[in-house]
Amino acid sequence: MNSLLMITACLALIGTVWAKEGYIVNYHDGCKYECYKLGDNDYCLRECKLRYGKGAGGYCYAFGCWCTHLYEQAVVWPLPKKRCNGK
């Protein structure tokens, strides 16, 4: 019984590690890509796929394009040492 519980816990942990998520960011100004149609959004899906590849997904969350199913080294908002609009 304990072995089954441990295996289940490990599988759940592995599932959370493999998929990175985050806001798509403009490298020049450090800002998130904005969107206004919350939820499923063709613009966000298209931009996430262009930046991160065919396997990425995307939708509008809190007026920013949120990308899913990213590779671990994917760069997402916030950029280190760079604030939006130079602030």
From Swiss-Prot:
Family, per entry: Belongs to the long (4 C-C) scorpion toxin superfamily. Sodium channel inhibitor family. Beta subfamily.
Q: Which SUPFAM superfamilies match?
A: Scorpion toxin-like
What name is this protein filed under?
A: Toxin Cll4
One GO molecular-function entry: toxin activity
Gene Ontology CC, one term:
extracellular region
- The LCN-type CS-alpha/beta domain extends over 20-85
- The UniProt entry lists the main location of this chain as secreted
Q: Which CDD domains match?
A: neurotoxins_LC_scorpion
Per the entry's comment, what about the domains? Has the structural arrangement of an alpha-helix connected to antiparallel beta-sheets by disulfide bonds (CS-alpha/beta).
- Look up keyword Endoplasmic reticulum and say if it applies: no
